Amino acid sequence: MPRIGAHIHVADPLAEAIAMGADAVQFFLGDPQGWKGPVIPGGDASVIKAAYAAADMDIYIHAPYVINVATSNNRIRIPSRKLLDQQLQAAASIGAKGLIVHGGHVNAGVDFGEGLENWRKAVERIERPLPMLIENTAGGDGAMARSLDAIGQLWEAVSEAAGDAGESVGFCLDTCHANSAGIDLADAVDRVKAITGRIDLVHCNNSRDPFGSGRDRHANIASGTIDPALLLGVVRSAGATAICETPEESGGLAADVSWLKQQLLFRTGWRA
């Protein structure tokens, strides 16, 4: 059975993840909207690594949202590349299984191919001591990882640049983003794997918005516009660790983790 976890915002992600019965956890190493370098919780990477290993808890780190290595704007692309490198090294130091980064976008009027070339350069120049997992996005003109066609072009560019049969570059499938981008979740896993050959992580999120909306607003599994059975089907088909990035209020995040684990264990249908 794949591991099921949650994105945790509190100061002690390990304790919170254990309390909700998760066996994987995702968190930020610093401000997700800022350009400052990563911060190791407690300041000692070896202590963090040992604690999570002792608890048999897999770690995934989400890179800051500001990173956009695809852009032609030097004032964003260059610091993005630097911050991505810092995040990769920091994530590796605490024993993370992967670093998730959004595909980014090119500005209006800029050729999509320029974004692909910027991604190639980033992958070629950045040391990757752990897998860098590119995540699909919900909307935006010039998005590098919104449509399946765009994902295909981006994957070809980065896997070729990686030069290691793609082992240091992977893919994270976000269900809310896919639904908002107009990708049918009923066969999304098969269609993505036909492009990438792999799905390394699933962000199992429902959506507050309708199919094809282009909006990125997560909802708890039982309360969004996506049939929970479709979300469960994605997790089962992908066979990868699933992380819930859903609202925490009123115990919703913990309930999502619990429901997913129960459904995967007992293979029953949705029960409201």
Where are these regions (language model features)?
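Conserved, mostly hydrophobic/aromatic
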Residues: 17, 62, 80, 91, ...
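Active-site acidic/histidine proton-transfer and metal-coordination neighborhood
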Residues: 53-54, 69-171, 180
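Non-cysteine beta-strand/loop elements that form the S-adenosyl-L-methionine
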Residues: 23-28, 57-61, 170, 174, ...
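Acidic (Asp/Glu)-rich catalytic clusters
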Residues: 15-22, 40-60, 85-95, 123-129, ...
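Short, electropositive alpha-helical surface patch
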Residues: 75-88, 111-124, 148-157, 189-193, ...
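N-terminal pre-domain/capping segments
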Residues: 1-63, 67-86, 270-272
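Gly/Pro-rich active-site loop or hairpin
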Residues: 110, 144-148, 152, 177-241, ...
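Active-site beta-loop-alpha junctions enriched in small/polar residues
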Residues: 7-11, 30-32, 64-68, 104-106, ...
